[in-house]
C-alpha cells in the first residue's frame, strides 16, 4: 500500500471516515454516506471476512495519517516492542509525528497540507528548522511557524479558524505568536478516532 495522492474526499467515502478531519469533507460524507462509483450504494450486502475487516482497519489508520505500508508497519513493530498497551503506544507514536502535531496545532488545515508545510521548511522545533514530516516530537518541544512564513495566506486563514476551534488537550497553543508546545502524550480517550486498533494488532499478528 503506497501513499494515496488522489482526492481525499473520494478516499474518505471509500473508507467510510473523514480522513481529512475537516468540516468540508464531513459535510460531503453526510450528503453521500456511501463509497464512490456506480456500485457504491450497494456495498456492504455481503458479510466481509475477518481478514478483510482487519485489513480495512489498518488501511484506514495508515491513510488517516498519510503513511505508506513500510513506514506504518515499522512504527507498529516499534510500538509492539516496548512496554505498555500496544494499540495506545502505536497511536501515541503516530500522534508524535511532526506533520501531525502541526495539524493538531492548527498551523495546517489537513495532515496532507501539514506534510507539505513541514517539507518546505516552514516549521521550527525548539527554534531550529526541521523539514522531516516523520520527525518525532518529544514532550515539552516547542513547535513554531518560521517568521518569514507567518504572512502566507493559508497560514493566516488557518490561525484565524483555529481561534474558533477547541485545541487538542495534549498541546498548548499561542495563536498570536504562531507557536505551541507538545505538553503530554495523548491518552486513548483523548483521541476521537473511528478506529479499532485491536483489529490492526490482530492483522499484523496473523
Curated annotation (Swiss-Prot):
Family that this chain belongs to: Belongs to the universal ribosomal protein uS4 family.
Domain (S4 RNA-binding) ranges: 96-171
Ribonucleoprotein among keywords: yes
Xref: SMART domains: Ribosomal_S4, S4
Listed name of the protein: Small ribosomal subunit protein uS4
Classification via HAMAP family: Ribosomal_uS4_B (MF_01306_B)
Region (Disordered): 29-52
Cellular component GO terms, alphabetical: small ribosomal subunit
Record key words, sorted: Ribonucleoprotein, Ribosomal protein, RNA-binding, rRNA-binding
Any single GO BP term: ribosomal small subunit biogenesis
Record note on quaternary structure: Part of the 30S ribosomal subunit. Contacts protein S5. The interaction surface between S4 and S5 is involved in control of translational fidelity.
PROSITE patterns named among the record's database cross-references: RIBOSOMAL_S4, S4
Pfam family, one: Ribosomal_S4
GO MF annotation terms: rRNA binding; structural constituent of ribosome
NCBIfam families cross-referenced by the UniProt entry: PRK05327.1, rpsD_bact
Function summary: One of the primary rRNA binding proteins, it binds directly to 16S rRNA where it nucleates assembly of the body of the 30S subunit. With S5 and S12 plays an important role in translational accuracy.
Top-rank lineage group of the source organism: Bacteria
Gene3D superfamilies: Ribosomal Protein S4 Delta 41, Chain A, domain 1, RNA-binding S4 domain
Gene that produces this protein: rpsD
Phylogenetic lineage: Bacteria, Thermotogati, Deinococcota, Deinococci, Deinococcales
Amino acid at each position: 500500500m503506497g501513499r494515496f495522492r488522489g482526492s481525499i474526499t473520494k478516499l474518505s467515502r471509500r473508507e467510510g471516515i473523514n480522513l481529512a478531519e475537516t468540516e468540508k469533507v464531513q459535510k460531503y460524507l453526510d450528503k453521500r454516506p456511501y463509497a464512490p462509483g456506480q456500485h457504491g450504494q450497494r456495498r456492504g450486502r455481503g458479510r466481509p471476512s475477518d481478514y478483510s475487516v482487519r485489513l480495512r482497519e489498518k488501511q484506514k489508520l495508515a491513510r488517516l495519517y498519510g503513511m505508506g505500508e513500510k513506514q506504518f508497519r515499522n512504527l507498529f513493530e516499534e510500538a509492539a516492542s516496548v512496554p505498555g498497551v500496544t494499540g495506545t503506544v502505536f497511536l501515541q507514536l503516530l500522534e508524535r509525528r511532526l506533520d501531525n502535531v502541526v495539524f493538531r496545532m492548527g498551523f495546517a488545515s489537513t495532515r496532507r497540507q501539514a506534510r507539505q508545510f513541514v517539507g518546505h521548511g516552514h516549521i521550527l522545533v525548539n527554534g531550529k528548522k526541521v523539514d522531516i514530516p516523520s520527525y518525532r516530537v518529544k514532550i515539552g518541544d516547542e513547535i513554531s511557524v518560521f517568521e518569514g512564513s507567518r504572512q502566507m495566506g493559508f497560514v493566516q486563514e488557518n490561525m484565524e479558524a483555529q481561534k474558533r476551534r477547541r485545541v487538542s488537550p495534549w498541546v498548548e497553543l499561542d495563536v498570536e505568536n504562531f507557536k505551541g508546545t507538545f505538553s503530554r502524550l495523548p491518552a486513548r480517550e483523548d483521541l476521537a478516532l473511528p478506529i479499532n486498533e485491536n483489529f490492526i494488532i490482530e492483522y499484523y499478528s496473523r
